[in-house]
């Protein structure tokens, strides 16, 4: 689950991390009231969406007066911001965050992620922060400095000092950076985060370090013990189909192809998408119905897939381990009849009662293409998407 910048900065402040004063508005009429809470005569105006690349897309602007702030809010509130991290539709802008400015001397980058290879938390720092950090990550790896922290012990001061030295910080600035490092480490571990990013972390001309931007992602699997964070969830930022899938415990991710995929198991789902690509097709989605797939969940999965107008064929790939393939076959037939599927459906069943499941499909009056192997299923689906079935 992602948080907005203003929400992340509230957490930063709670953990003693240095941020500038800011306030959120949700309507143009609120702009004057919001700016009255802030000092200075110019402010940073930032569209609040769950995506990076806002600055390059025009979603961040330094406004010089109240009139310019109103104009920015009027331009963006209720609109959709498209960045290199969103799809072509972008994400809705429902809030503008206004923040006091500072005199920037230098920009750094600092983040923490879960490193699954080492089973630790990886802190990454760079002296080249700002809007072009993606290019730095691709072309200037020597500018990325890393340190691993053990989740049992958390970050240690010497690790913060080590990163600070590599960034060229010394004296009081080294201590400031170490304090920020320790605060982020506590925040990351105590709130079960999967990502925290400060870009840029700036050094002001007055010699202070400030977290000028903040990005936080929370581990969805830990939300049951963080009701305070769950309350911050903004469902308007989610794909509508993904939000609907969550209600039925379906794992759905929208993609940009035309072959709808319904699979049980995340690994099998990824393998299915790979083989569809191998045969020249493009998956329209990732959809994992889970190990305990039922008729009802299969029907809901069909409904969600078919809300995508790009879908030309649905590929159902089920391995019967926990579930029985004959029950899945009955569920597919019932779902096709209930939902009124108008596109070709390719079904591949393997595992428990697979042969029985294939017989049920063959004896039904529903137009379903049955595959004997995953390769055949992919080939049938790709051909059907091309209109060759």
UniProtKB/Swiss-Prot annotation:
Cofactor(s) in the UniProt record: Mg(2+)
Asked whether the keyword Nucleotide-binding is assigned, the reply is yes
One Pfam family it belongs to = ATP-grasp_2
Which organism is this entry from? Haemophilus influenzae (strain 86-028NP)
Identification of the protein by name:
Succinate--CoA ligase [ADP-forming] subunit beta
- What family does the Swiss-Prot or TrEMBL record give for this protein? Belongs to the succinate/malate CoA ligase beta subunit family.
Q: Which UniProt keywords apply?
A: ATP-binding, Ligase, Magnesium, Metal-binding, Nucleotide-binding, Tricarboxylic acid cycle
Superkingdom of source: Bacteria
Question: GO cellular component terms?
Answer: cytosol; succinate-CoA ligase complex
Reaction catalyzed = succinate + ATP + CoA = succinyl-CoA + ADP + phosphate; GTP + succinate + CoA = succinyl-CoA + GDP + phosphate
Cite the binding residues for substrate.
264, 321-323
Query: Where, if anywhere, are coiled coils annotated?
Result: none
Q: How does it assemble?
A: Heterotetramer of two alpha and two beta subunits.
The EC number(s) this enzyme carries = 6.2.1.5
An annotated Gene Ontology molecular function: magnesium ion binding
Q: How is the cofactor bound?
A: Binds 1 Mg(2+) ion per subunit.
Q: What is the lineage of its organism?
A: Bacteria, Pseudomonadati, Pseudomonadota, Gammaproteobacteria, Pasteurellales
Functional description taken from the UniProt entry: Succinyl-CoA synthetase functions in the citric acid cycle (TCA), coupling the hydrolysis of succinyl-CoA to the synthesis of either ATP or GTP and thus represents the only step of substrate-level phosphorylation in the TCA. The beta subunit provides nucleotide specificity of the enzyme and binds the substrate succinate, while the binding sites for coenzyme A and phosphate are found in the alpha subunit.
